[in-house]
UniProtKB/Swiss-Prot annotation:
This is UPF0246 protein SZO_18530. Signal peptide: none annotated. Belongs to the UPF0246 family. GO terms for cellular component: cytosol. PANTHER family: PEROXIDE STRESS RESISTANCE PROTEIN YAAA (PTHR30283:SF4), PEROXIDE STRESS RESPONSE PROTEIN YAAA (PTHR30283). It holds the Pfam family H2O2_YaaD. GO terms for biological process: response to hydroperoxide. It comes from Streptococcus equi subsp. zooepidemicus (strain H70).
């Protein structure tokens, strides 16, 4: 069975219904460390304005007091990749695929199933906070590595920010899809191409119930097709040809 890893997104959009929120035990020290920061320190930790930090402080307080509503993570996150992922009108099989084979890597919640109920929050691995003297990456690394150890065939749709939380010995075992577009005879890639393509790729996987590496190579989605010439054992290249 294939296991997919995807990143969080800064943009969030609450979609009813909401649910009670239960913060995982491992997330509590992070919440406590963030709650100890002054408004100025919080602004520096997030690299945002005081006004924006005030909004985050209220969110953190609501989470700490158990008053924050929670939403399925794949519905709450609303970045470019998530907007290009099929999230509505899923069949039972597609919903099962999304909730049982796709996991979100979070600097606040750890590695969670896509349908895990989470609260609105602002947090990533660039957030400047230490937990018992450790950076966020070092704090989560044992748990991330254990996940990689327990899941033999990982398909990584992670950016380097999230990928680097894992020890390199696990990273080198993954399959990492790469997405490029052909323009004026040249192959181009940038974050917008990659983010949109990740969502379309994952949609194709759940719609076709892809379970093997060979099936990944047969996929065609949003104009992208597998390119055997560029691909390696661990990097699968998908190219969108000029029309």
């Amino acid at each position: 069975m294939l296991t997919f890893l995807i990143p969080t997104a800064k943009e969030m959009k609450p979609v009813p219904p909401c649910y009670p929120h239960q913060l995982p035990q491992k997330s509590l020290p992070i919440l406590e460390a963030m709650a100890e920061l002054s408004l100025e320190e919080l602004a520096r930790a997030y690299s945002i304005s005081i006004e924006a930090a005030s909004k985050e402080a209220k969110r953190l307080k609501a989470i700490a007091q158990g008053q924050s509503p929670a939403y399925p993570a794949y519905q709450l996150f609303n970045g470019l990749m998530y907007r290009h992922l099929k999230r509505d009108n899923l069949s039972k099989a597609q919903q099962d695929y999304l909730s049982k084979q796709v996991y979100i890597t979070s600097s606040f919640y750890g590695i969670i199933p896509t349908d895990e109920k989470i609260a609105e929050h602002r947090h990533d691995f660039h957030t400047k906070v230490t937990i018992n003297g450790q950076s966020l990456k070092h704090y989560w690394r044992p748990i991330y590595d254990q996940f990689a150890k327990d899941h033999k065939q990982i398909i990584s749709l992670l950016s380097s920010e999230f990928k680097d939380v894992f020890s390199k010995e696990y990273q080198k075992l993954w399959i990492s899809p790469k997405f490029m577009e052909e323009r004026s005879g040249q192959l181009k890639t940038h974050s917008t191409i990659s983010k949109k393509a990740r969502g379309a790729f994952l949609t194709a996987c759940l719609e076709n119930n892809v379970q093997t590496k060979e099936a990944l190579k047969q996929l065609s989605f949003a104009g992208f097709c597998y390119n055997e010439e560029l691909s390696t054992e661990t990097d699968y290249y998908y190219i969108k040809k000029e029309s």
